[in-house]
Amino acid sequence: MKLALLGYGKMGQGIAALATAKGHTITAQINSKNTLQQQLEQALQADVWLEFSTPDTALNHIRTAIKHQKPIVVGTTGWYAHLNELRQEVVKFNATVFYARNFSLGVHLFFKLNQSLAKAMQNHPPVVRLDPPWRHG
């Protein structure tokens, strides 16, 4: 698969190493010195864009992906105030945007643990805790 990496910090570099080890090709590596506008031609050769930059930059990257109908996976947080307007653009351009509010392994493990715990506890009676009111004086 051909990938464009939009944001080449720790996460972008880690993805690049993993992707190339699995036989994928990186068509563009976007960072503060090599912008998407400068490498747009290379980025458009990718099958999918992976976005791990900054909130302001991510918004521009997402809009560019939508405009060019490039599927984009967004790991950057902090741009959600624009989510509703981006949804309208996705519909207008028939684009694909996948985002997650947190790509942290620890957070995903926590959610999985909670799901497992909820499943294990579903056949047990509910737990109720009653605290007596505090009396001062």
Regions found by a protein language model. Give the residues of each.
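Conserved anion/nucleotide-ligand pocket segment
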Residues: 109-137
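Rossmann-fold NAD(P)-binding glycine/threonine-rich loop
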Residues: 63, 76-100, 105-117
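Glycine-rich adenosine-cofactor-binding loop
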Residues: 2-15
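NAD(P)-binding Rossmann-fold cofactor-contacting core
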Residues: 14, 18-39
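Hydrophobic beta-strand scaffold residues
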Residues: 26, 72-73, 96-97
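Rossmann-fold NAD(P) dinucleotide-binding segment
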Residues: 40-44, 48, 52-76, 83-86
